[in-house]
Amino acid sequence: MGLIVYYSSRSENTHRFLLKLERRLFRLPLGAEEDVPQVSEPYVLVTPTYGGGGTKGAVPKPVIRFLNEPSNRNLIRGVIAAGNTNFGAAFASAGDIVSRKCAVPFLYRFELLGTEEDVANVKHGLERFWTR
């Protein structure tokens, strides 16, 4: 099964959700002072959504830095986004933005830590996605 590249802030919400998937994970660094990592295989990106309800600033800066590297951008195959339903139409909007800019499918959205149903849906969805 393919690699999951993800960003999780200090809140660790995205990280804790992904640990439940029991898949290969590659975490993007928190700070801008670290070099941009390079991946060498296709991956699905998982990102939280920032910005308090608007689309400006919705994609975390470390995710933008990572995707601005052409070699990383060429290997993205899909995106999953976390968000907060309190932000209405902007819920998980980082996924919409990455999907549009990278021309990849937006596979799933979940709220904060996700539910057990979200975990099952993502596990099953990724299995189908990588074996199609």
Curated annotation (Swiss-Prot):
Q: Which GO terms describe its molecular function?
A: FMN binding
One BP term from GO:
protein modification process
Q: Which SUPFAM superfamilies match?
A: Flavoproteins
Which InterPro entries does the annotation name?
Flavoprotein-like_sf (IPR029039), RNR_Ib_NrdI_bac (IPR020852), RNR_NrdI (IPR004465)
> What job does this protein perform?
Probably involved in ribonucleotide reductase function.
What family does the database annotate? Belongs to the NrdI family.
Q: What is the protein's name according to its record?
A: Protein NrdI
